[in-house]
Regions:
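Conserved short beta-strand edge segments in small beta-sheet-based binding/regulatory domains
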Residues: 137, 143, 228-234
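Polybasic (Lys/Arg-rich)
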Residues: 161-233
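Minor-groove-contacting beta-hairpin "wing" of winged helix-turn-helix DNA-binding domains
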Residues: 1-6
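Core beta-strand-centered patch of the WYL/Sm-like small regulatory domain
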Residues: 60-179
Length: 234
């Protein structure tokens, strides 16, 4: 027999559009032309009365929006990288490091992540490496397809969600387990910053916590907490 399946397309509502607009503005990830183009299209989804309310709410933030210093448009680059990831294409990139030195790399791109203002390309170098290398997308000066592809068995596919939970400040490196105590005012902030963190015990307001993380980024964050953190096992 036949079964009638009801299908409907729901537009974003004004509350969802406001939330997305706030996230875009706060991220500072896009240069003004790209940002305003997205905001205009989002707000255009609203009925006129709600449209004017949202425009009023974000008017000041939009006017005083301060883009990042690199000033580069990123939407095309993000799309091209995403297609290369999907097609498992080996890329040749020309990259400018933080110190201004240019380097060329053959990479196997596996994911794009966003963290604290910047988009990052996660990839493996053409020569086999144990853990991925991270490149800031705005520092990729040139990108070319090599015409070659790479294969990753399904069981070994890169899981960007799992990686994201274990990398801090986009510093790559080997996977480590860190154990520390925390005596600050908000253990919730620690759990939010370190998604793999687990509380082992709590005594007199001091929490013993363990977390998994790649690289040295976690050391930088723990060090920034001052005497509220004491590292037990590193």
């Amino acid at each position: 027999g036949y079964r009638l399946v009801h299908s409907s397309y729901e537009h974003l509502n004004h509350k969802e559009i406001l939330a997305l607009a706030k996230i875009l503005l706060e991220s500072r990830a896009l240069e003004p032309v790209e940002l305003h183009g997205i905001l205009d299209k989002l707000i255009a989804e609203c009925p006129p009365e709600e449209r004017s309310i949202i425009e009023g709410i974000i008017k000041s933030e939009t006017f005083y929006y301060v883009p990042l210093k690199h000033g580069k448009k990123l939407l095309n680059r993000l799309w091209d990288l995403s297609l290369a990831i999907r097609g498992q294409e080996i890329l040749h990139i020309r990259y400018t490091r933080m110190d201004g030195i240019h380097r060329e790399h053959l990479v196997k791109p596996v994911a794009i992540l966003f963290s604290e203002y910047y988009f990052y390309l996660v990839s493996f170098k053409e020569e086999e490496s144990e853990y991925p290398t991270i490149f800031r997308v705005d520092r990729i000066e040139e990108m070319e397809k090599t015409g070659k592809t790479f294969q990753i068995p399904y069981a070994n596919r890169f899981k960007d969600g799992e990686f994201r939970k274990r990398v801090q400040f986009m510093y790559p490196g080997p996977l480590r387990r860190v154990k520390f105590t925390y005596s600050g005012p908000s253990v919730e902030a620690v759990l939010d910053r370190l998604p793999t963190a687990q509380i082992l015990e709590e005594k007199d307001g001091v929490y013993t916590i363990t977390a998994e993380a790649y690289g040295i980024g976690i050391d930088m964050w723990l060090g920034s907490q001052g005497d509220r953190v004491k590292i037990l096992k590193n």
